[in-house]
Amino acid sequence: MIVTQIAGKIQVIFGPMFSGKTTELIRRIKRFNFANKKCLLIKYSKDTRYNDNIDKSFLVTHDKQNYQAFPCSILEDVKEQAQNYDVIGIDEGQFFPDVVQFSEDLANQGKTVIIAALDGTFQRKPFQSVIDLVSKAEYITKLTAVCMVCYNEAAFSKRIVESDDIELIGGIDKYISVCRGCYNSDQNEGNSTKPSKTARHSHSQSAPSVAPLAVNINPDDHLNNDY
């Protein structure tokens, strides 16, 4: 008896703010589209940071790339619609309370699910749902940004406004990417790290360039399986 396996997969793209997670998500979705796969991109409905002059259904990156997306706050609401697609992309995955079960269910049905998410809060504490996804994912990509204080490689997000809320959506007006040294320096001094004037100016229109780090498995090496 021959048993046919349905090749569903979960891909996780994580890292700090301004590391290019959404840009990488859109790149992969475009690539699957080029391979004649039906793709659905889902965005967090409360994230409208860059939608001032564009429809709120579009997902917009820090450097103003945009892509048509379906906005929602609970993934279960779009689960039935997702059945009609081969590939499902999810941006800001850390904010969806049901992201783990949603991704696992669809992957078990033969879908490819790609999640872009922060791996930690501004306090460097993990988002548990993202950690849970790692144990269920076939492909994991960790991205880094550029430190907006010293220009070294940055693995952490630092909040520069006064708020203890975990969910505080914003761009460079509320966050900067920092390296370990600059993050710890701020903690020791007990005040908010501020990007240099040069850093703030140079990053006002676009995010720092992406610096991939510790890529465990590159999905591009598995074209025959994914397409």
From Swiss-Prot:
Residues 187-227 are annotated as: Disordered. Keywords: ATP-binding, Calmodulin-binding, DNA synthesis, Kinase, Metal-binding, Nucleotide-binding, Transferase, Zinc. It holds the Pfam family TK. The keyword Methyltransferase does not apply. The active site is at 92 (proton acceptor). Zn(2+) binds at residues 147, 150, 179, 182. GO terms for molecular function: ATP binding; calcium/calmodulin-dependent protein kinase activity; calmodulin binding; identical protein binding; metal ion binding; thymidine kinase activity. The keyword Transferase applies. Its EC number is 2.7.1.21. Substrate binds at residues 122, 166-170, 175. One of its GO terms (biological process) is thymidine metabolic process. It catalyses: thymidine + ATP = dTMP + ADP + H(+). Belongs to the thymidine kinase family. Interacts with calmodulin in the presence of Ca(2+). This is Thymidine kinase 1. The gene is thyB.
